[in-house]
């Protein structure tokens, strides 16, 4: 919020927040499909955010604030609306990973129009880095494609490599994000997630964190968007 206030005081948009999933081709295809209206309204979203492992200093708060925070931003952008409520529930905890982290967790978000979203965070699956997004619409189910490695047939088996971190999975998105920032900066404007987007993401993440600690459903309450960010 302080960044939003400082930017408005400066009188010009100066901040591009580092949410790179908006630049991923899979998410862009999903958004185009939703925005087209061809498949009706989005009703439900089923998502997952899985990592092979995380450092030993990870704790419960980081499942939302370091992991699922990316879903909080990209799904708000994808659907074009804010959240109304947030909750976080626990699965049976894996024996893998840090002692202060209950893993996996499920975050449930409801948008202001009533779209229900569930996001699984499993950050010690000891397997691969895997991001999923399925959108259930009135007339179709939309699944996000993902870039793949080649399929190899060898020694009477078929196999395909899997991603092990976000830098492999989202390499093209990172490059597109940075290039967008460079191009916009050279031209003297901001193009991408704004400071207001960052504020909205942090409000929802804070509500989800409170929901996790209290095991309740929490409202997501934003300030009214200033005219400065409506332009």
Each model region followed by its residue ranges:
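A contiguous active-site-proximal alpha/beta segment in oxidoreductase catalytic domains
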Residues: 1-55
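A structural signal for well-ordered alpha-helical segments within the folded catalytic domains
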Residues: 24, 28, 69-73, 172-179, ...
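Alpha-helical elements of Rossmann-like donor-binding domains used by nucleotide-donor carbohydrate transfer enzymes
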Residues: 2, 29, 73-74, 106, ...
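NAD(P)-dinucleotide binding in Rossmann-like oxidoreductases
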Residues: 90, 96-100, 112-177
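Rossmann-like dinucleotide-binding domain that binds NAD(P)(H)
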Residues: 54-128, 196
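Short aromatic-enriched loop/helix-cap "lid" or pocket-rim segments at secondary-structure transitions
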Residues: 27-29, 56-60, 98-101, 131-132, ...
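C-terminal helix-rich "cap/oligomerization" subdomain common to oxidoreductases
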Residues: 1-4, 8-9, 183-231
């Amino acid at each position: 919020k302080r960044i939003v206030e400082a930017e408005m005081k400066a009188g010009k948009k100066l901040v591009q927040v580092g949410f790179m999933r908006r630049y991923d081709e899979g998410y862009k295809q999903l958004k185009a499909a939703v925005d087209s209206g061809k498949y009706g309204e989005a009703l439900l979203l089923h998502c997952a955010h899985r990592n092979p492992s995380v450092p030993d200093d990870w704790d419960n708060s980081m499942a939302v604030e370091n992991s699922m925070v990316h879903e909080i931003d990209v799904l708000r952008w994808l659907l074009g609306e804010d959240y109304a409520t947030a909750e976080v529930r626990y699965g049976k905890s894996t024996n893998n990973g840090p002692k202060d982290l209950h893993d996996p967790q499920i975050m449930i978000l409801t948008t202001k129009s009533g779209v229900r979203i569930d996001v699984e965070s499993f950050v010690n699956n000891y397997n691969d880095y895997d991001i999923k997004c399925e959108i259930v619409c009135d007339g179709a189910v939309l699944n996000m494609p993902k870039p793949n490695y080649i399929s190899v047939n060898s020694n009477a088996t078929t196999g395909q490599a899997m991603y092990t971190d976000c830098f492999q999975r989202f390499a093209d998105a990172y490059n597109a994000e940075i290039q967008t920032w460079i191009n916009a900066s050279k031209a003297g404007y901001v193009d991408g997630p704004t400071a207001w987007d960052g504020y909205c993401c942090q409000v929802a993440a804070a509500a989800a964190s409170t929901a996790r600690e209290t095991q309740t459903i929490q409202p997501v309450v934003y300030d009214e968007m200033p005219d400065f960010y409506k332009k």
